[in-house]
Amino acid sequence: MRAPLLPPAPVVLSLLILGSGHYAAGLDLNDTYSGKREPFSGDHSADGFEVTSRSEMSSGSEISPVSEMPSSSEPSSGADYDYSEEYDNEPQIPGYIVDDSVRVEQVVKPPQNKTESENTSDKPKRKKKGGKNGKNRRNRKKKNPCNAEFQNFCIHGECKYIEHLEAVTCKCQQEYFGERCGEKSMKTHSMIDSSLSKIALAAIAAFMSAVILTAVAVITVQLRRQYVRKYEGEAEERKKLRQENGNVHAIA
């Protein structure tokens, strides 16, 4: 068999030079195109998907979903990394998270300054009076409620507080009685006054009856006299008539 004929050396060299030139030109074009479209290669959408460059889309490749956002231990960008460092530097305060964007923390009282602590220490501390068992408190005189709560309790009297009974009473004025001295007593007549009044009433009744009887007697007497006078006048007229009649008969 005959060996295949090899191309001449100048042709091979020219092909190699042309291929290297095309390769170098293709690399320069890819670098410039990738520099212009750099935001698309590294952008992430709001839902956590990575968007490929236009060169990849033009070549027919589809948008490939990327897995969930990287964990806090591996930040995806410089901004996220800065926030994570800030959260790490903050003091850990116990709290609870209501939402992804809201964090509720407990209120912590700020520490006192040295000046405030010195001012508080300069103030004299009040000494507690009385022993531990409170004997002196028991021996203290209790406040009189008549001076505060029951100041206007008694209407017509004076308020009195009885300590051993722990009760409030009223010392009423004359002619007043009751719990609050609000009732007034009326004066009652003695037996002598009542008997005198009875005697006076009897005398008045007797006098009135006597007056009435005398008036009746006087009236009856006057009526009788009038009747008698009238009767006597009629009798005299009858006598005169009889006398006249007798004289007439005698003449006839």
From Swiss-Prot:
Keywords: Cytokine, Disulfide bond, EGF-like domain, Glycoprotein, Growth factor, Membrane, Signal, Transmembrane, Transmembrane helix. The chain crosses the membrane at residues 199-221. Residues 1-19 form the signal peptide. Glycans are attached at N30, N113, N119. It comes from the Eukaryota. It is found in: Membrane. Residues 124-143 have a biased composition (Basic residues). PROSITE patterns: EGF_1, EGF_3. GO terms for biological process: cell-cell signaling; dichotomous subdivision of terminal units involved in mammary gland duct morphogenesis; epidermal growth factor receptor signaling pathway; epithelial cell proliferation involved in mammary gland duct elongation; ERBB2-EGFR signaling pathway; G protein-coupled receptor signaling pathway; glial cell proliferation; mammary gland alveolus development. Gene3D superfamilies: Laminin. InterPro entries: EGF-like_dom. Induction: By phorbol 12-myristate 13-acetate (PMA). Residues 142-182 form the EGF-like domain. It is a single-pass membrane protein. Residues 20-100, 188-252 form a propeptide. The keyword Signal applies. GO terms for molecular function: cytokine activity; epidermal growth factor receptor binding; growth factor activity; receptor ligand activity; transmembrane receptor protein tyrosine kinase activator activity. GO terms for cellular component: cell surface; clathrin-coated endocytic vesicle membrane; endoplasmic reticulum membrane; endoplasmic reticulum-Golgi intermediate compartment membrane; ER to Golgi transport vesicle membrane; extracellular region; extracellular space; nucleus. SUPFAM superfamilies: EGF/Laminin. Belongs to the amphiregulin family. AR is a protein containing cysteines in disulfide linkage(s) that are essential for its biological activity. AR may contain oligosaccharides and/or lipid moieties that are not obligatory for the biological activity. Ligand of the EGF receptor/EGFR. Autocrine growth factor as well as a mitogen for a broad range of target cells including astrocytes, Schwann cells and fibroblasts. This is Amphiregulin.
